[in-house]
């Protein structure tokens, strides 16, 4: 033990007496293994980084200030250039085919706002469906993305999410025997709408040809529940044709709603190729006419999609027939193919053409017309113009039947 202690003392004293022979060479910071001096220590210039083609292009191009200020390169395009459709070759080598790109005026933002998530949570919590989701509507980010729920619009889809028909343009699920109706749906729908503090709501439904009444009584009961919870609520109903049963059409029309909507979807000549074989253009006209006869004060509404290959004369003929049965409101929108299994788009109609047809419809005497590439039947249905018309009619005492009268009419039809 004493020997070890003496040895440690010797080593310690030897280390203290080591002579300093010169300055210590600085070690490079790049690695612990090298003993070469760093450029900063020797004063030698650093080696310049090799330039690349990408860097040269960036340096030679416009600056951020040029981009913001604009210039000749950023001048507005002529309509012919702005509306020109672009194509691309897609597919594996040897089997590429030309595809038309979606026009810029049809592109919309991805829905991701907080309000979108809140609305979706409310709907799922009450087991409700919306046509916004089921039909893959491109406007969902706009309609659901308001800063608060009162600014948002959602079209509730009644009677489930499965339709008994198979139209070639629609992405809603189809089945000959969908699940039975939810008896709590009318109450849940009224509850959800009362939570949102909306002033205008749109109800629609899938076609239920498996039911004796097509779901008309279920539809009418939902309207009555909404009016009971909030009599001032303006309700628009977008219904099916009930296989031509006009008594069911009149039943829904007398339920207390404010706007009766039924879509003809396309011109008469293309109806057999676009819609399910059980739906016809003339049958849709009879539905709209029956609704107006049941309630002459009722606003009736329909919608057409453009881009199926319709001609101008066919559109003129469709508008003339719609006016002949007293339709008040018409909308035009661009057909957009949901999946490859659906009918292809024949033409992308430009915004200028949509504006032209809006003016033509108003000149023919339609009360209101919404026309644009992204317009859908229930898109911004509660426009200020329609709301003002309805409120004026209500103030004048021509708003139709009361909730009590509507319930009595439904009860009578049920017996």
Swiss-Prot record:
Residues 146-367 form the Radical SAM core domain. Residues 1-32 form a transit peptide. Keywords: 4Fe-4S, Iron, Iron-sulfur, Metal-binding, Mitochondrion, S-adenosyl-L-methionine, Transferase, Transit peptide. It is found in: Mitochondrion. GO terms for molecular function: 4 iron, 4 sulfur cluster binding; lipoate synthase activity; metal ion binding. [4Fe-4S] cluster 1 binds at residues 132, 137, 143, 378. InterPro entries: Aldolase_TIM, Elp3/MiaA/NifB-like_rSAM, LIAS_N, Lipoyl_synth, rSAM. Residues 33-47 have a biased composition (Low complexity). Pathway: Protein modification; protein lipoylation via endogenous pathway; protein N(6)-(lipoyl)lysine from octanoyl-[acyl-carrier-protein]: step 2/2. Its cofactor is [4Fe-4S] cluster. Disulfide bonds: none annotated. Residues 22-32 have a biased composition (Polar residues). It comes from the Eukaryota. [4Fe-4S] cluster 2 binds at residues 163, 167, 170. Binds 2 [4Fe-4S] clusters per subunit. One cluster is coordinated with 3 cysteines and an exchangeable S-adenosyl-L-methionine. Its EC number is 2.8.1.8. GO terms for cellular component: mitochondrion. It catalyses: [[Fe-S] cluster scaffold protein carrying a second [4Fe-4S](2+) cluster] + N(6)-octanoyl-L-lysyl-[protein] + 2 oxidized [2Fe-2S]-[ferredoxin] + 2 S-adenosyl-L-methionine + 4 H(+) = [[Fe-S] cluster scaffold protein] + N(6)-[(R)-dihydrolipoyl]-L-lysyl-[protein] + 4 Fe(3+) + 2 hydrogen sulfide + 2 5'-deoxyadenosine + 2 L-methionine + 2 reduced [2Fe-2S]-[ferredoxin]. Belongs to the radical SAM superfamily. Lipoyl synthase family. This is Lipoyl synthase, mitochondrial. It comes from Aspergillus oryzae (strain ATCC 42149 / RIB 40) (Yellow koji mold). The lineage of its organism: Eukaryota, Fungi, Dikarya, Ascomycota, Pezizomycotina.
């Amino acid at each position: 033990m004493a020997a070890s202690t003496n040895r440690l003392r010797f080593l310690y004293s030897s280390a203290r007496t080591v002579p300093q022979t010169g300055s210590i060479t600085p070690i490079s910071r790049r690695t612990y293994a090298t003993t070469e001096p760093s450029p900063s220590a020797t004063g030698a210039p650093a080696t310049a980084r090799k330039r690349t083609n990408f860097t040269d292009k960036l340096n030679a191009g416009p600056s951020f200030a040029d981009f913001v200020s604009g210039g000749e390169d950023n001048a507005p395009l002529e309509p012919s250039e702005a509306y020109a459709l672009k194509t691309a070759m897609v597919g594996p080598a040897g089997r590429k085919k030309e595809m038309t790109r979606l026009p810029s005026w049809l592109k919309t933002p991805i829905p991701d706002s907080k309000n979108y998530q809140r609305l979706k949570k409310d709907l799922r919590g009450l087991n409700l469906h919306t046509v916004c989701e089921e039909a893959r509507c491109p406007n969902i980010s706009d309609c659901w993305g308001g800063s608060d729920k009162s600014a948002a619009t959602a079209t509730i889809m009644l009677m489930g999410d499965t339709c008994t028909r198979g139209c070639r343009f629609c992405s809603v699920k189809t089945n000959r025997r969908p699940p039975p109706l939810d008896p709590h749906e009318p109450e849940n729908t009224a509850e959800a709408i009362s939570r949102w503090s909306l002033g205008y709501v749109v109800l629609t439904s899938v076609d239920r040809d498996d039911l004796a009444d097509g779901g008309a009584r279920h539809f009418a009961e939902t309207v009555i529940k909404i009016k009971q919870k909030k009599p001032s609520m303006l309700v628009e109903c977008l219904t099916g044709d009930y296989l031509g049963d006009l008594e069911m059409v009149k039943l829904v029309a007398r339920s207390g709603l404010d706007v009766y909507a039924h879509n003809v979807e396309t011109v008469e000549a293309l109806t057999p190729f676009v819609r399910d074989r059980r739906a016809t253009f003339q049958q849709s006209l009879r539905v709209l006419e029956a609704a107006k006869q049941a309630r002459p004060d009722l606003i009736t509404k329909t919608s057409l999609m453009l881009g199926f290959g319709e001609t101008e004369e066919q559109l003129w003929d469709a508008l003339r027939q719609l006016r002949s049965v007293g339709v008040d409101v018409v909308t035009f929108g661009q057909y957009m193919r949901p999946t490859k299994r659906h009918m292809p788009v024949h033409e992308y109609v430009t915004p200028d053409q949509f504006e032209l047809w809006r003016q033509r419809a108003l000149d023919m005497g339609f009360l209101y017309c919404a026309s644009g590439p992204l317009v859908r039947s229930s898109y911004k249905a509660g426009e200020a113009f329609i709301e003002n018309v309805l409120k004026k009619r209500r103030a004048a005492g021509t708003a139709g039947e009361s909730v009590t009268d509507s319930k009595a009419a439904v009860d009578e039809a049920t017996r």
